[in-house]
């Protein structure tokens, strides 16, 4: 995997092929379809990068808006052993970079049933709080944050 620029074509490709867990999350939190959610996220971000898989296909986009870090992806994001390894290694470097750039704690909300994301967030050093109602649907989400 490698970092690439989040062009319009990349945004469309990831938005139209978003993994189910991320689609559910953006619908419950903001009542948005995947393409609209990822487009708005990219446009509002202060820092933004896209992720290309080993096969050259975009598999995700991540960014930070104010102090809110986010990642939306396709099933390709974790489809191979190589992708999973890079996501863990590069993910930690990305979060460290974002913390340095923002200069304040960063965090966001994750749907409580999105167990893979919660496990990954903890691996990246985030504190994940207990579920509470959040967003458009009032579904249970866990706030997560990291200060250093």
Model features per residue range: what roles?
Residues 89-106, 126:
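Conserved acyl-CoA
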Residues 50, 55-70:
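Conserved beta-strand in the GNAT
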Residues 65-86, 142:
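Conserved acetyl-CoA binding element of GNAT-fold acetyltransferases
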Residues 1-32:
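Short amphipathic alpha-helix that is part of the acyltransferase structural core
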């Amino acid at each position: 995997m490698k970092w690439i620029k989040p062009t319009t074509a990349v945004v469309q490709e990831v938005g139209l092929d978003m993994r189910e867990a991320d689609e559910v999350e953006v619908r419950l939190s903001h009542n948005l379809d995947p393409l609209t959610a990822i487009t708005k996220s990219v446009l509002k971000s202060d820092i933004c990068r896209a992720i290309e898989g080993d096969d050259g296909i975009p598999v995700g986009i991540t960014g930070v808006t104010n102090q809110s870090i986010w990642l939306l992806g396709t099933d390709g994001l974790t489809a191979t052993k190589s992708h999973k390894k890079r996501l863990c290694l590069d993910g930690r470097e990305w979060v460290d970079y974002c913390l340095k750039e923002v200069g304040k704690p960063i965090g966001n909300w994750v749907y409580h049933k999105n167990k893979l994301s919660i496990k990954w967030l903890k691996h990246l050093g985030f504190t994940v709080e207990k579920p509470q109602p959040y967003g458009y649907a009032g579904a249970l989400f866990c706030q997560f944050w990291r200060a250093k």
